[in-house]
Amino acid sequence: VIVGGGFGGLKLANKLKKSGFQVVLIDKNNYHQFPPLIYQVASAGMEPTSISFPFRKIFQHRKDFYFRMAEVRAVFPEKNMIQTSIGKAEYDYLVLAAGTTTNFFGNKHIEEEAMPMKNVSEAMGLRNALLANLERAVTCSNKQEQQELLNIVVVGGGATGVEVAGVLSEMKKFVLPNDYPD
């Protein structure tokens, strides 16, 4: 059983292709998403379907592969069993490759106000918020409120933060003058 269909889970599932093992992949989504391009979804540069690939399609010709869309609720190593949102699953070997969570480093304000971007759903939330703020700013008569709507803070200097900052800069320079001339 492999829990998590990110890069690690997919790599292992592919490595086990001719191993003789029956592979069960469990993920909360029924698709693999390509994290390096999530920022493109957030900036409306790409659609979610361009970076999302259904597990069943990826492994459709594998006879020893099974996919279950579920979330793991508990692990019972002494019983070689996991409890998921759709029931129990037994295993000979268990690999936990469920990915990461956003680290706010104890900053409660950022944790409460920030919009993390670890998946397509969060990227779409960010995209919708950006576009809604742009539309509201166009019709806003209060200059201070308009400035607040257009003020964007990128927290984090990792790959995602740098990519988001870069694409926002490109949008400001090339997209916004054409799409929002007023």
Predicted regions and their residues:
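Beta1-alpha1 glycine-rich phosphate/pyrophosphate-binding loop at the start
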Residues: 1-66, 152-153, 159-182
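FAD-binding core/adjacent interface of flavoenzyme oxidoreductases
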Residues: 66-153, 171, 176
